């Protein structure tokens, strides 16, 4: 009687490094298949996932909407300036909308955004929601005349710039002169956008001054108080 050897059974679901025979005598390289599968899973698992909030902002950017919803700093300014340049390059005629809910922040970062808003050929519509304070107020009124909006419960805060000063007596003098220069520059820009006099702006911004949406409209920070997106003309916030 001839000796017949039987292949060792492979436990279901177990993939080893050894080769196994199929019914046709072909060799199935199960170890290689398992390695390939694991690598494929690893590639999918290790792929960076964009945070949900960032995904929303990126989708809004496709509709030419920029959100300024944090304190104004250098990183935010660089991002918004880049987005303005990108949207202008894609279409130099369609409006760009900036929604503002910000407590303010760095004067120089804000001035970078301001200059870029004036630099691009597009009309830049601004929308105040929540709070547009300090540099947020400055950027709000810098929108294209006739396209500056406030939602009903938005609050606007205007005040003079502030900052710490230190060092030698000579350094303190230089820093104080620079702060006065910045204060006057901001007052001139706000006066130009609101129709108020520079003297009036400097007087009103000497201390914190709050405005309701309607008061902001009367003062010249915005042109319209809106309660619904339907009140915005066709070239509106999301086109």
Regions found by a protein language model. Give the residues of each.
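N-terminal organellar transit peptides
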Residues: 1-135, 141-239
């Amino acid at each position: 009687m001839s000796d017949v050897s039987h292949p060792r059974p492979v436990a279901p679901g177990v993939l080893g490094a050894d080769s196994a025979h199929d019914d046709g005598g072909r060799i199935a390289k199960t170890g290689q298949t398992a390695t390939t599968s694991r690598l494929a899973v690893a590639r999918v698992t290790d792929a960076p996932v964009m945070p949900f909030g960032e995904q929303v902002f990126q989708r809004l950017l496709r509709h030419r909407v920029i959100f300024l919803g944090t304190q104004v700093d250098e990183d935010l300014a660089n991002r918004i300036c880049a987005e303005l340049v990108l949207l202008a390059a894609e279409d130099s005629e369609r409006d760009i909308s900036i929604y503002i809910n910000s407590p303010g922040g760095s004067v120089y970062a804000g001035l970078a955004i301001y200059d870029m808003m004036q630099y691009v050929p597009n009309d830049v519509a601004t929308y105040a929601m929540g709070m547009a304070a300090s540099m947020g107020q400055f950027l709000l009124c810098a929108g294209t005349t006739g396209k500056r909006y406030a939602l009903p419960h938005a609050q606007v805060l205007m005040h003079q710039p502030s900052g710490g000063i230190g060092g030698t007596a000579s350094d303190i003098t230089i820093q104080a002169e620079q702060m006065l220069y910045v204060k006057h520059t901001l007052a001139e820009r706000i006066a130009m956008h609101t129709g108020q006099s520079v003297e009036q702006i400097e007087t009103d911004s000497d201390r914190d001054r709050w405005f309701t949406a309607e008061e902001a409209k009367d003062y010249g920070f915005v042109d319209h108080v809106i309660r619904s997106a339907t009140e915005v003309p066709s070239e509106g916030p999301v086109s």
